[in-house]
Amino acid sequence: MELTKVTVTTGAFNYSPIIKTALVGGLASSLIETATVNTTVAPGSTGNTTINYDINTQSVLYYSTNVTANWTLNIRYATGTSLNSALAVGQSVTFVMIVTSAATAYYNSAITIDGVSITPKYQGGTAWSAGNASSWDVYTYTAIKTAANTYILLAAQTQFK
């Protein structure tokens, strides 16, 4: 593992390091991961039918306002940085999207990685065709990079009330 010391003497400073390390046969406990709570723009609102999920900024993305239309989820590393360039072959990332539904249920109807359509492997073997009304739908995804621009994407939808 390589860490770098940063000293700031004046002004404001935001530092968001990426530390890559290998842990083989080890035990990690009490990990804390970042969750983004979006209280203003739900999927489908104001024509927002494509959601860019930047995995470098959160492991969980929660929309607390009601979903108003089906949406496409685009998975990428960051604005201007592809997932393909961030992951090596054999690496994976797991992330979650939580949406709030009112009486009319909507769902994640399409998925892309770096803007390219991908067909996931769905838990239970059948693609979801609807969301769940008056509840939270939790979508869990694992993307495994198997070659350049090639992934296995595992996807699950779970209802919480």
Describe the residue ranges of each PLM region.
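Glycine-rich, low-complexity segments
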Residues: 1-56, 148-161
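Acidic, glycine/polar-enriched metal-coordinating patches/loops
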Residues: 48, 66-161
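Flexible, charged surface loops at secondary-structure boundaries
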Residues: 53-57, 87-90
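Short carbohydrate-recognition loop motifs
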Residues: 57-64
